[in-house]
């Protein structure tokens, strides 16, 4: 999700306040007053289309419930839901990152997820308010050109990237919201003032190598146009698959355990309070963290980590159980507003 799209969420939240004074809908996985045996669920999805389509197909086959998917950037969809308020046609909202869901939850637009569904994933990867569930995860990593840098030369901390030694060698894609959790983590650990100075430093070091998206960033690192950048893990794996192993001149590596640059990003889903198909929406949420959908995530080329039902990580990824990220929580990541404000102040948005 682009930073401009998340800003739309925050702007839309002002207008949404007047639209969310609606009665709560009590739902269970067994049914509800807003259900139909022939219902067609409307899914607003900001997740990878390939993964979502595979999961939807499996859900339809298993349940007989049809799903109509509207695919777009999660920021665009979140802003639209806020504008639509209680009249939104969406039944379920699925995202790549937690801040978009937190924004909707903060305005009372999501209903509670069934306890039995939430129990399928660790509580730390789902909404503190229990109104959305964690479905999959990614981890922020270093990507570096292996012809120009040895692994032993890599920074141990994301803070080191502001040092003069990386001037002209660093790549950034600051408008990608995958970068914002790192900014939030830096601010949470070191304070906003130091986070601002760090952003000024990396902006200076990345001058001439600031890209519009992570795909461009990882491509430029791989081609040797720039030495190092910070991305979510799956961008490197997808580049490897795209260009073929013989043309890979880069690698991914983690920051030191617990570093603010070593962050878990959670992709999740929630059901809308305004859904006219409450029971079916809850069934879909349960399916997302059940074994069938989680195995699809584990084997899919999106290279994400499954979070539910004890499904193991895909073979190419560092095992999820061995990751040692910054302890920042989804609650602390919030709506992403802290990161957005800092990035704006640093002229990176």
State each model region's role:
Residues 211-274, 309-316:
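Extracytoplasmic/periplasmic substrate-binding proteins
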Residues 193-194, 306-349:
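An extracytoplasmic/periplasmic, membrane-proximal ligand-sensing/linker region
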Residues 1-40, 349:
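Short, low-complexity disordered leader/linker segments with a strong preference
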Residues 55, 194-198, 267, 276-288, ...:
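Short amphipathic alpha-helical coupling segments at ligand-binding clamshell hinges
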Residues 168-174, 287-311:
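Periplasmic-binding protein-like
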Residues 141-148, 264-277, 296:
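A bilobed periplasmic-binding-protein/Venus flytrap-type ligand-binding module shared by bacterial periplasmic
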Residues 46-53, 72, 76, 88-226, ...:
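Extracytoplasmic ligand-binding site segments that recognize negatively charged/polar headgroups
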Residues 28, 35-103, 349:
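Early extracytoplasmic/lumenal segment of secretory-pathway proteins
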């Amino acid at each position: 999700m682009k930073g401009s799209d998340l800003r739309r969420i925050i702007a839309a939240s002002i207008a949404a306040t007047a639209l969310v004074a609606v009665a709560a809908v009590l739902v269970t996985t067994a049914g509800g007053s807003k259900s139909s045996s022939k219902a067609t669920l409307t899914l607003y999805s900001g997740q990878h289309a390939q993964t979502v389509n595979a999961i939807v197909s499996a859900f339809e086959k298993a349940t007989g419930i049809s799903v109509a998917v509207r695919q777009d950037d999660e920021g665009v969809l979140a802003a639209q839901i806020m504008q639509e308020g209680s009249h939104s046609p969406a039944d379920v909202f699925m995202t790549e990152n937690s801040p978009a869901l937190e924004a909707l939850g903060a305005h009372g637009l999501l209903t509670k997820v069934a306890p039995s569904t939430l129990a399928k994933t660790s509580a730390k990867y789902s909404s503190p308010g229990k109104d959305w569930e964690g479905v999959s995860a990614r981890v922020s990593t270093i990507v570096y050109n292996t012809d120009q840098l040895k692994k032993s030369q890599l920074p141990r901390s994301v803070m080191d990237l502001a040092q003069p030694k990386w001037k002209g060698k660093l790549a950034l894609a600051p408008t990608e919201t995958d970068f914002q959790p790192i900014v939030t983590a830096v601010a949470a650990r070191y304070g906003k003032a130091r986070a601002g100075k760090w952003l000024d430093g990396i902006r200076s070091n990345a001058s001439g190598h600031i890209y519009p998206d992570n795909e461009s960033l990882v491509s430029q690192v791989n081609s040797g146009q720039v030495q190092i950048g910070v991305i979510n893990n799956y961008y490197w794996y997808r580049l490897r698959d795209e260009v073929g192993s013989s043309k890979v001149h880069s690698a991914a590596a983690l920051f030191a355990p617990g570093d603010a640059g070593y962050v878990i990003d959670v992709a999740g889903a929630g059901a809308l309070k305004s859904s006219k198909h409450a029971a079916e929406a809850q069934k879909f949420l349960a399916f997302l963290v059940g074994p069938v959908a989680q195995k699809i995530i584990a084997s899919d080329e999106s290279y994400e980590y499954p979070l539910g039902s004890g499904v193991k990580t895909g073979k190419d990824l560092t095992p999820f159980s061995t990751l040692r990220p910054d302890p920042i929580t989804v609650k602390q990541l919030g709506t992403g507003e802290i990161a957005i404000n800092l990035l704006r102040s640093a002229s990176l948005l």
